[in-house]
A protein has these predicted regions:
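Residue-level detection of the helix-turn-helix DNA-binding "recognition helix"
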Residues: 7, 23, 27, 132, ...
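Active-site beta-loop-alpha junctions of metal-dependent nucleic acid enzymes
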Residues: 64, 68-69, 86-108, 120
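Mobile genetic element proteins and their domesticated derivatives, centered on retroelements
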Residues: 2, 18, 58, 75, ...
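C-terminal domain-tail junction helix/linker
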Residues: 47, 134, 158-235
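An active-site-proximal beta-strand-loop segment
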Residues: 54-84, 90-92
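RNase H-like two-metal-ion nuclease catalytic core shared by retroviral integrases
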Residues: 116-118, 124-129, 138-161, 171-180, ...
Length: 235
């Protein structure tokens, strides 16, 4: 088609020359078709009957003072809204997500199901293989329907208000320090209206089996760490 179009425009090059230039300009490469996702079925968002039934995952983005982009991988247990992890880094590909989930399972135990959106890290083949090896069901919400994962969305909003929008971080290590201190405060101190104004660990102690489901592990000075960070930033 290109050859005949050029001939009509008055160019008398032969078809071999046209093809040679065409391929040299890499115009002969096929367009990559967008990968179609399988149909997602809307699932009811129900409170699990206990810990480690359903975890919810999501990513967030922010920038350091230098302008460099950072990402966070947030993981919560839907039963008591407990923040199991906030992993902060500049890049969080599928293999890194798997590594973080393996760390969580090592101390928390394995969930029956994980819920997330259709991000490329979550739909990757490596993630499907990991789920099969660990016999974990992965529930994807429908594209463009973040309300179907509203528990982690609500958590993200709180984390952004309390930390990401409140402080400007100079380095990745500083962002991690604030995130870790905030997670401890969120799990052990901050009351949640959806939990009867109990903190997640208090709710787990009252309605779950705390001894069988350890919570976010950190030293005993975690609350004072968060308070000192907040007071230091305000001064």
């Amino acid at each position: 088609m290109m050859y005949h179009r050029l001939r009509k425009l008055g160019f008398i090059w032969n078809h071999k020359r046209v093809y040679r230039i065409y391929t040299a300009m890499r115009l002969n490469l096929r367009n990559k078709r967008k990968k179609r996702l399988p149909a997602r079925v809307k699932a009811p968002l129900l409170r699990p009957i206990g810990p480690n039934v359903t975890w919810s995952l999501d990513f967030m983005h922010d920038t350091l003072a230098s302008g460099k982009t950072i990402r966070t991988l947030n993981v919560i247990d839907d039963f008591n809204r407990e923040a199991l992890s906030i992993c902060v880094d500049t890049s969080l590909p599928a293999h890194r997500v798997i590594m973080e989930l393996d760390k969580l399972i090592e101390w928390r135990g394995k969930p029956e199901k994980i819920r997330s959106d259709n991000g490329p890290e979550f739909v990757a083949e490596a993630m499907r293989d990991w789920c099969e090896r660990n016999t974990i069901e992965w529930e994807f919400i429908q594209p463009g329907k973040p309300t179907q994962n509203s528990l982690i969305e609500r958590f993200n909003r709180t984390f952004r208000q309390d930390v990401l929008d409140s402080y400007m971080f100079e380095s990745l290590s500083e962002a991690r320090k604030y995130a870790n201190a905030w997670v401890w405060m969120y799990n052990n101190v901050r009351p949640h209206s959806s939990l009867g104004h109990l903190a997640p660990t208090e709710f787990l102690l009252k309605y779950g089996k705390l001894s069988e489901f350890p919570t976010f592990q950190q030293d005993d000075n975690s609350e004072s760490d968060w308070n000192s960070l907040v007071l230091g930033a305000a001064s």
